[in-house]
Structures are given as C-alpha cells and as structure tokens.
Swiss-Prot record:
Name of the protein in question: Class I hydrophobin 4
Tissue-level expression: Expressed in conidia and aerial hyphae.
Signal peptide residue numbers: 1-18
Function: Aerial growth, conidiation, and dispersal of filamentous fungi in the environment rely upon a capability of their secreting small amphipathic proteins called hydrophobins (HPBs) with low sequence identity. Class I can self-assemble into an outermost layer of rodlet bundles on aerial cell surfaces, conferring cellular hydrophobicity that supports fungal growth, development and dispersal; whereas Class II form highly ordered films at water-air interfaces through intermolecular interactions but contribute nothing to the rodlet structure.
Mutant lacking the gene: phenotype: When the four class I hydrophobins (hcf-1 to -4) are partially silenced, approximately 10 times fewer conidia are produced an the germination efficiency of conidia is reduced by about 50%.
Family that this chain belongs to: Belongs to the fungal hydrophobin family.
Organism: Passalora fulva (Tomato leaf mold)
Keyword Metal-binding recorded: no
Amino acid sequence: MQFTTFALLAVAAATASAQAPQAYYGQGAKSAQVHTFETRKAVPTRVAEVYGEHEQERVTKTKVYHALVTEEAQHHGEEHKAAPYKAYKVYSVASSYSAQPRATHAAEHYGEGKKADHYAEPAKAVHADPHHVDPVKARPTMAATEMKQPEKEAPSTVCAKGSEISCCTTDSSNSGALGNVLGGSCLLQNLSLLSLNSNCAAANTFCCPTTQEGTLNINLSCIPISL
C-alpha cells in the first residue's frame, strides 16, 4: 500500500516537472508574440501622429503666411486710397488716327488757318546788302582750285637759312619738279656742309624740309617748298 502511494507520487512529480518548462516557455512565446504585435501596431500609429504634427505645423505656417499677405494687401490698399493715382485710358494709335485725322485734330486746337502751301511774300530780300556773298554760291569749284602741275624743270630756288631746310634732288628716272612731286627723295649733293641750306645748285632741285643737319638729310622724303 505504501509502495503504491509512493509510486503514484513519483509519477505525479515527474509529470509536473516535465510540464513546468513547457508551460514556462509557452507563456514566454505568447508574451513575445503579444509584444511584437503591439509594437507593429504602435509604429504606424506613431508615424501617423508625427505626420499629423508636421501637417498641423504646415497648416499653421500657411495660415500665418496668408494672414501676413492679407495684412500687407490691406495696408497697400489703404495707401492707394489715401493717395489715389490717376488712371489713363489707353488709345490705339491706328484707331485714333483713323477716327480723327491729324488735320482735323490740329484745326480743333489751333483753329482754321492758312493753307500749308500759301505763305506771305517777304517785303524785301533777306540779304539786302549788295556786298553780301552767298557762301554756297561763292564756294570754289574744282576748276578754280585745280592744282597746277609744276614744270618739268624748275628754276634754282633759294632755300631758307637754318637747319630745317636743305636742298634735295630727284632720282634719275624722274627729273625736275615733276620727279619731286612723284616721290623723289632728299639726296646729299656734291656740296660742302656749309653750302647746304643755301642756293640749290641745279635746276632740277627743290628745297626740302628736314629736322636733321648735314649728311643726315639723306633719304628723307622730298616736299617742294617753293619755286
């Protein structure tokens, strides 16, 4: 009888010890499942709350902005009422000219006047002075101002004294005054330095200006001074 009772107690204890871990882990797994479900349900809720807060902030800022714009518009409206500007009506150029020609418009403003092609004759000429010379008519023509061509051979010319004038001659192909006009150059003649700036020796020479002295006058451009 005692053995049987002991055996039953042992079996009951073994069964209880075997079921205890299973019950513990079963409750833990269930708790974890509940926690995970609650977390998944809470995350979208929090996102929605944050979005709602941002949206509310945006709406508030928008209302403040619109209030400022409205206040500014009212302020400018009050300024315009205090100092109104004059509005001008815009007319089309084409329509205004077609509806009201220029001559009619001028007649309304200035009254009927004389015709445009009729003017009173002057009592006397504007320039009654007989010594008055019309500058247009007195302008010289090309025929009057035509340059005279120099003679082929110019007479000997007396050059001015000083270092700014010397004698020059032409090249061999163009002799005389014509050669100088066509581009002869100042050449050193067979003259002493003292004879420079004096009478030109030959008939085919000119006086040529220069800023140099003596032999430095060679190959300067020849410019006729006087004949």
